[in-house]
């Protein structure tokens, strides 16, 4: 069967502990394979920061809000999935009660916000500040600022790759990467115009241009270019400027990956290639049970049959689904 060109669906998601979160507009679903083998699906709404404000629609500015929303929602989804694997006899701690009291009963949301802030601080420290200090060790014998900016960027990318490779050795992270692959396979299956069956999902690609991994790579790339123009000598000023520029970096990176998700020309393919390569580290081939969980999450927030009819111009029936089951696997 001839390969179909991908069509943008608007859905996205992320892997969680033993499950997948999928988001479509303001609805999101978290599907988790519980310890007893059953699939639990929770559907909620998330309107996001600056909801209803036109500022969220502005190019570059919207990328900052989308990045923060992704972190907040992702943390919330991870906390929900982890709750199924906590000790059954665990009791509410004093910390939990204090969080609920401070937030007016919304302790979980407050905790998600705190975790998000801590995560951002650690990420900035590890991948923005640390590469600068490591690269500064070369300043005694390299006087060219342009070359120093490139060295700093290379160190930043190397640290990120080392981090991704290092945590992949952990069993739980490897399973998280498998669910990450299942999430991508579901989206690719739909956007290639195939019915959302386990067979079709398993034969779809686990790599996707709109992946957060690719976004992080673009952040690294854009930061190299922007930091290239920081021409100050004071160490504190250099570090502060790098931190202050991160929202700008995130905004530009979002626009690039947004364009990549909606365009399929040779330039975009070349630009997306490094991020797609890194996804080979952050995604692993899932098994069929993981594909089932991902499908359950998609179906809770997205009418894929209507999407196939509206986008590709055909209705899905049982005979057509059987024909699609014989489609060749994607690379």
Segments from the language model and where they lie:
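Select subsegments of transmembrane alpha-helices in polytopic membrane proteins
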Residues: 111-127, 208-219
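Polar-ligand-bearing catalytic/cofactor-coordination segments
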Residues: 2-12, 16, 20-22, 142, ...
């Amino acid at each position: 069967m001839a390969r179909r060109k991908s069509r943008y669906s608007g859905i996205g998601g992320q892997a969680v502990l033993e499950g997948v979160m999928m988001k479509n507009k303001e609805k999101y679903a978290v599907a988790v394979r519980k310890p007893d083998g059953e699939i639990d699906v929770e559907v909620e709404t998330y309107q996001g920061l600056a909801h209803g404000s036109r500022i969220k629609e502005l190019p570059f500015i919207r990328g900052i809000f989308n990045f923060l929303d992704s972190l907040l929602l992702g943390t919330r989804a991870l906390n929900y999935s982890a709750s199924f694997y906590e000790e059954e006899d665990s009791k509410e701690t004093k910390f939990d009660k204090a969080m609920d009291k401070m937030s007016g009963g919304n302790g979980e949301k407050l905790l998600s916000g705190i975790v998000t802030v801590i995560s951002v601080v650690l990420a900035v420290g590890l991948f923005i500040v640390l590469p600068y200090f490591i690269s500064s060790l070369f300043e005694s014998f390299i006087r060219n600022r342009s070359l120093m900016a490139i060295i700093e960027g290379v160190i930043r990318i190397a640290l990120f790759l080392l981090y991704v490779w290092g945590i992949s050795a952990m069993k739980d992270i490897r399973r998280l990467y498998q669910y990450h692959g299942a999430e991508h396979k579901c989206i690719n299956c739909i956007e290639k115009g195939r019915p959302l069956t386990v067979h079709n999902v398993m034969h779809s690609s686990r790599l996707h241009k709109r992946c957060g991994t690719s976004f992080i790579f673009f952040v690294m790339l854009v930061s190299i270019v922007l930091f290239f123009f920081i021409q100050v000598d004071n160490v504190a000023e250099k570090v502060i400027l790098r931190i202050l520029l991160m929202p700008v970096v995130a905004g530009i990176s979002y626009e690039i990956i947004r364009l990549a998700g909606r365009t399929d020309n040779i330039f975009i393919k070349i630009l997306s290639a490094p991020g797609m390569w890194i996804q080979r580290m952050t995604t692993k081939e899932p098994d069929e049970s993981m594909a089932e969980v991902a499908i359950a999450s998609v179906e809770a927030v997205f009418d894929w049959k209507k999407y196939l009819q509206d986008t590709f111009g055909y209705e899905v029936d049982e005979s057509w689904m059987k024909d699609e089951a014989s489609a060749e696997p994607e690379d």
